[in-house]
Amino acid sequence: MLPGRLCLVPLLLALGVGSGGGSGDGGDSRRRRLLVAKVNKHKPWIETSYHGVITENNDTVILDPPLVALDKDAPVPFAGEICAFKIHGQELPFEAVVLNKTSGEGRLRAKSPIDCELQKEYTFIIQAYDCGAGPREAAWKKSHKAVVHIQVKDVNEFAPTFKEPAYKAIVTEGKIYDSILQVEAIDEDCSPQYSQICNYEIVTTDVPFAIDRNGNIRNTEKLSYDKQHQYEILVTAYDCGQKPAAQDTLVQVDVKPVCKPGWQDWTKRIEYQPGSGSMPLFPSIHLETCDGAVSSLQVTAELQTNYIGKGCDRETYSEKSLQKLCGASSGIIDLLPSPSAATNWTAGLLVDSSEMIFKFDGRQGAKIPDGIVPKNLTDQFTITMWMKHGPSPGVRAEKETILCNSDKTEMNRHHYALYVHNCRLVFLLRKDFDQADTFRPAEFHWKLDQICDKEWHYYVINVEFPVVTLYMDGATYEPYLVTNDWPIHPSHIAMQLTVGACWQGGEVAKPRFAQFFHGSLASLTIRPGKMESQKVISCLQACKEGLDINSLESLGRGIKYHFNPSQSILVMEGDDIGNINRALQKVSYINSRQFPTAGVRRLRLSSKVQCFGEDVCISIPDVDAYIMVLQAIEPQITLQGTERFWRPAAQFESARGVTLFPDIKIVSTFAKTEASGDMRATGTAPKSAVLEEMLHNLDFCDILVLGGDLDPRQECLELNHSELHQRHLDATNSTAGYSIYGVGSMNRYEQVLHHLRYRNWHPTSLETRRFRIKCSELNGRYTSNEFNLEVSVLHEVRVSDKEHVNHLIVQPPFLQSVHHPETRSSIQRSSVVPSIATVVIIISVCMLVFVVAMGVYRVRIAHQHFIQETEAAKEAEMDWDDSALTITVNPMEKHEGPGNGEDETTEVEEEEEAEEGSSSSSSGSDDSEEEEEEGMGRVRHGQSGTSSQSPERSTWNTAGVINIWK
C-alpha cells in the first residue's frame, strides 16, 4: 500500500489536493514543501571517480566504471529518477546525457572532435541530479562531486620532419669518424608511439657513409680529398609507426686535407687600472683549428676569484650599511656583529677581522643574550647569511647547527633551527599550541651541491608560514621535502638562542652545547615580521667584478652565450669559428668598485669542439692568464672647520641648543704625480706631487664626547630625524656620542653634521665641552683625520659692594695662550661684545665712586691719585647703594697687541696699590671673586679700542644690576 500512496503524492500535488480553504496561498506552500520533503528524501549517488579514453577525432568516451546514477527514492516517480548529469568546468569539450532516467544510465561524449596534439588529457567534475518531487518542482537534489579523468588516444596523422632542411660537415681525409654529424627529425603526434623517431635511413646509394637509429652519420672508409672533395647524401626518417618523413634532408660532407690547433695572439698578464670600466681581455685572439672538421665550438671563460673575500670582490661596507644601500626594510638584527661592549657574545669566536668572517671548527658556539631577538618571530621573517661549508666529517654525520632556539633548562625542545645534515640544508620551525593546534609543516629540506662545495654562497630564507623559500646566490629553490609535526606544548621554560651549535638544556646531566657547526659564517641576520624582496636579495649578494661583453648587439648570428649569476663564468657556443673569434674579442673584465681589492684574478679559457657527432674532435689547449688589479689611489679624507668657539649660557639652555659644526667641510684628496715642464732642457722629468680632490662615499661618521660621557639629566646631542631620513642615513645616540651611518656622499654627511646640536640645561657648572669627529669609507678601510672641537660657555659674574671689583679688570692668564685666525663667526661675536678696554675704564670709574662713597680717607687719597692718572678716560660718575652689583662682562674682544695689555695691567697694579690699605677688610671676598672669575671659561683676544671710540651705555635695573654693553 505504501508505494501506491507514494505514487499518488505527485498527482495530488499537481491537482492542488490538500489546499483547503481558509489557509490561503501560504498554507498551500507550506504543505507542498512538507510533501516534497517527505517524498524526495535522498540524493542521487554516483562513483567517486571515473577514468575514460577517447580516440582522437572521435566523440565517444569509454568510461570505467560506466556512468550510472542511483537514487534510494526509487521507484518513486521524479524523486527516484535521474534527470541530468552536469559537468563543472570552463570550456570543456564534453557533455553528459541521460540515457535512462529510471535506471540512471548516462553517457559522456565529446561536443566536437578531440585533438590530442592540443591536449592529451582532461580532468573535470561531474554530478548527477534527480527530478525532484514533481514536474513543477525545481528543487532537484544533486549527488556528490565525482572526478573524471579522460585520456586522448593518439592517431598517427603526422609524418616526421627534419629540424634543418640541409646539413653540412667538414671532415679530414684519412680518418675514420665514429660520428661526422647528427641529423634530427621530429614528429608532431602526441603519443610516444607516433611522436618518437625510431629509425633513420640513407636514401642515396653507393656512398661510404652509414647512419644509426640516433641520426649519427659516420664514414665507413677513409676518405680521400684527391678522390672526391664533397659528398651529398639524402637521409629520411621513420617514426615508431613506420611512417616515413614527408621530405628527405640533404647532408653535405666536405673533405679537407690534413696542423696544431690552439688559441693565438693572447696575453698572459692583463693589468686593470681601477676606475677604467670595462676592459677587453682578448682583443686579438683567434682560434687555429688547422682546418679541422668543426661543426660547433663551445668556449668557457672562467674568472677564478674564490680566494678573494666571499668568492668575489664585493662591497666591504658593514652589514647595516649594505642593507640600507640595497633598500632593505628596517629591523634587521645582526647575530654575528663585531665584538664590542654591547655585542660581546662573538668575542670568543674565531674571526677574520678584515672581512668579519667567523670560523667554526666544531668546538665552539655563541649564546645570543635575551632580548636581542624577540621571542615571537611572527609568521613572516627572513634569515640571511654567507656560508662556506665542506663535506661533513665522519661516515654518519651529525647535525651541524647554524642557528638554534631551544629550551634553556629542563627540556631539549628545538623551537626553530637552521642546520646542515648530510649536505642538506634543513630549517626547523615548531609552532606553539597558542599559535596553532593542528598538524603543520615543521621541517623544510633542501638538497644542493653548493652546500658542501667549500665555496662561499649567499643564503636567504624567506618565511611566510607555512611557505618557506630559499634563495641561494639570488636563485630560488623550493624544498624537496617538507615534514609535518604537532605544535610544541606550552610551558614556562625560557629559551636560548645560539649560533654555531645548539644548546642542550635537558636530558643531560649538565646543560651544554651540541651539534657543532664546521665551516665559516658571515653576516648572519634575522628580520622578524618582514620578508626580503628578490631585488634586495640580488643586491646584497651581487659581485662588483666579473666578465662582461662589450656591445652585445654586434655579436654574430648563431652565437649563444650564458653567464652564471655572479658573472664569473661565461659560456659561448656557436657553429661558426669566425663569429666565435669576434665574440671572444669582445669579452671584457669589469670592476665597478671605486676602490677594488688589489691582486691577481686568475683567468682560464677552455674550449670544446664538436666535429659532427664526436664529443671532441680536436684537442685545444686551455688558456691560462691572469688579471692584475692594480692598487687603487688611496684617498686622504680631511675634516675642516672651526675648532673652538664660545656661546652665551642662554644659548645652551634654549630649545635649539648650540650648533656644533656649522661650517664643517669634508674633503677627500689624493696625490697625483706630474712631470715638470723643463724635461726638454734637462733631459729628465722631475716629478712633483699635486693634490687633486676626488669624490666618493662615506659609510659612517662618529662624534665622540671627550672628557667623560654626557649626563642625560642635563645635556644631550640632538639631530632631527628628518635631516637623516631625507638623505637616506641613520644614526644611533648614546651618552658616549653620536654615530651617523649609511652609504652616502660626503656632501650628505656635511649637511647632516651642520644640523647636529648640543644642549645643556645647567650650563653654569660647565666650562668647556670637547668633541671629536672621525669619518670612514668602506667600514674603516679609509678613515679621516680626528677633528677636535672645543665649546666654551660665557658666564655672568655677580659681585657685591663689599668685594673688590678692581681685580676683574686683570686679564686672565689663559688669555695669552689662545690664538685663532679670524672667522666669520668671530666677527659676529665681536660686534655684540664690548671691548675689554672699555670695560676696564668703566669699572675703574665705578670703583672710584665706590671708594668715595665709603668715606675712607686712605681710600680717598688712593683714588685721587688714580683719578689724576685716568682723568682723561673718565666719562661719568655714578653713586649706588649697598645692594649687590651685577656686571655682565664679555671678554671676547681682541687686543691690538701686547702693549695695550701691558698698559692695562699697569693701571690695575696702580689701582691695587692705591687700595692696598683698605683691601684687608675684603680679602675673603677676593678669594670668592677669583673663583667666579675662573669659572668664566676660556675667551678669545679681542681688539681693544679707546673709550672715545667705543661709547658705552649704562642702565639701572630694579634689582640694582648694571648691564654694561658696547
Swiss-Prot record:
Compartments where located = Postsynaptic cell membrane; Endoplasmic reticulum membrane; Golgi apparatus membrane; Cell projection, Dendrite
The GO terms this record gives for MF are: calcium ion binding
The record lists glycosylation at N58, N100, N344, N376, N720, N733
Biased composition range(s): Acidic residues = 901-916
Q: Which domain of life is it from?
A: Eukaryota
Q: Ranges in the Extracellular compartment?
A: 21-835
Give the record's keywords alphabetically: Calcium, Cell adhesion, Cell membrane, Cell projection, Endoplasmic reticulum, Glycoprotein, Golgi apparatus, Membrane, Postsynaptic cell membrane, Repeat, Signal, Synapse, Transmembrane, Transmembrane helix
Q: What happens when the gene is disrupted?
A: Mice show a deficit of GABAergic interneurons, associated with hyperactivity, deficient spatial memory and social behavior. Mice show a selective reduction in functional inhibitory synapses, associated with a selective reduction of parvalbumin interneurons in hippocampus and cortex. In neurons, a reduction of symmetric (inhibitory) synaptic density, length of synaptic contacts and postsynaptic density is observed. Moreover, cortical neurons are characterized by the predominance of the simplified type of synapses with the emergence of negative curvature of the synaptic zone.
Provide the Gene Ontology terms for cellular component.
cell surface; dendrite; endoplasmic reticulum membrane; glutamatergic synapse; Golgi membrane; postsynaptic density; postsynaptic density membrane; postsynaptic membrane
Which stretches does UniProt call biased (Polar residues)? 943-960
How is the protein modified post-translationally, according to the record?
Answer: Proteolytically processed under normal cellular conditions. A primary zeta-cleavage generates a large extracellular (soluble) N-terminal domain (sAlc) and a short C-terminal transmembrane fragment (CTF1). A secondary cleavage catalyzed by gamma-secretase within the transmembrane domain releases the beta-Alc-gamma chain in the extracellular milieu and produces an intracellular fragment (AlcICD). This processing is strongly suppressed in the tripartite complex formed with APBA2 and APP, which seems to prevent the association with PSEN1.
Which ranges make up the Cytoplasmic topological domains here?
A: 857-966
Function as written in the Swiss-Prot or TrEMBL entry: Postsynaptic adhesion molecule that binds to presynaptic neurexins to mediate synapse formation, and which is involved in learning and memory. Promotes synapse development by acting as a cell adhesion molecule at the postsynaptic membrane, which associates with neurexin-alpha at the presynaptic membrane.
The family assignment reads:
Belongs to the calsyntenin family.
Q: What is this protein called?
A: Calsyntenin-2
Q: Which organism is it from?
A: Mus musculus
